[in-house]
């Protein structure tokens, strides 16, 4: 089981946590949503849950709940700039299809 984070994503998450002034790391998860079935969740973590799995890469803790791990194993979290847009990108080897709008995926 593994989760990794790119240099650009690590820098962005670290900056967000520093600006926020608190937080243990970043929670990465999935929820049922959209036309393809699942969507990613990204949120700051202030307290750990009993079923959390912690991965640390490039000085950033990425926390995943046990139920989401099966869908996220092997995922790399990246931060990209494309033209005027910038944001987090999920390089997930488990994805079999994505919806046309890019909001959800299926495994």
Curated annotation (Swiss-Prot):
Name the cofactor(s). Answer: Fe cation
Q: How is the cofactor bound?
A: Binds 2 iron ions per dimer. The dimer may bind additional iron ions.
Alphabetic keyword roster: Iron, Metal-binding
Q: Which Pfam families match?
A: Fe-S_biosyn (PF01521)
Carries keyword S-adenosyl-L-methionine? no
Matching Gene3D superfamilies, A to Z? HesB-like domain (2.60.300.12)
- Which residues does Fe cation bind? 35, 99, 101
GO CC field? cytosol
A Gene Ontology biological process noted in the UniProt record is: iron-sulfur cluster assembly
Query: What GO molecular function annotation could you give as one example from this UniProt entry?
Result: iron ion binding
Q: Does Ribosomal protein appear among the keywords?
A: no
> Quaternary structure per UniProt?
Homodimer; may form tetramers and higher multimers.
Q: What does this protein do?
A: Is able to transfer iron-sulfur clusters to apo-ferredoxin. Multiple cycles of [2Fe2S] cluster formation and transfer are observed, suggesting that IscA acts catalytically. Recruits intracellular free iron so as to provide iron for the assembly of transient iron-sulfur cluster in IscU in the presence of IscS, L-cysteine and the thioredoxin reductase system TrxA/TrxB.
Similarity comment: family membership = Belongs to the HesB/IscA family.
Instruction: State what protein this is by name.
Output: Iron-binding protein IscA
Origin organism is Yersinia enterocolitica serotype O:8 / biotype 1B (strain NCTC 13174 / 8081)
Q: Lineage of the native species?
A: Bacteria, Pseudomonadati, Pseudomonadota, Gammaproteobacteria, Enterobacterales
């Amino acid at each position: 089981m593994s989760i990794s984070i790119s240099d650009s994503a690590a820098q962005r998450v670290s900056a967000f946590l520093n600006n926020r002034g608190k937080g243990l790391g970043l929670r990465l998860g999935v929820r049922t949503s959209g036309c393809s079935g699942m969507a990613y969740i990204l949120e700051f973590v202030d307290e750990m849950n009993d079923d959390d799995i912690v991965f640390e890469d490039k000085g950033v803790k990425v926390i995943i709940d046990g139920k989401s791990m099966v869908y996220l194993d092997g995922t790399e979290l990246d931060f990209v700039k494309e033209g005027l847009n910038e944001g987090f990108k999920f390089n997930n080897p488990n994805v079999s299809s994505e919806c046309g709008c890019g909001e959800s995926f299926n495994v």
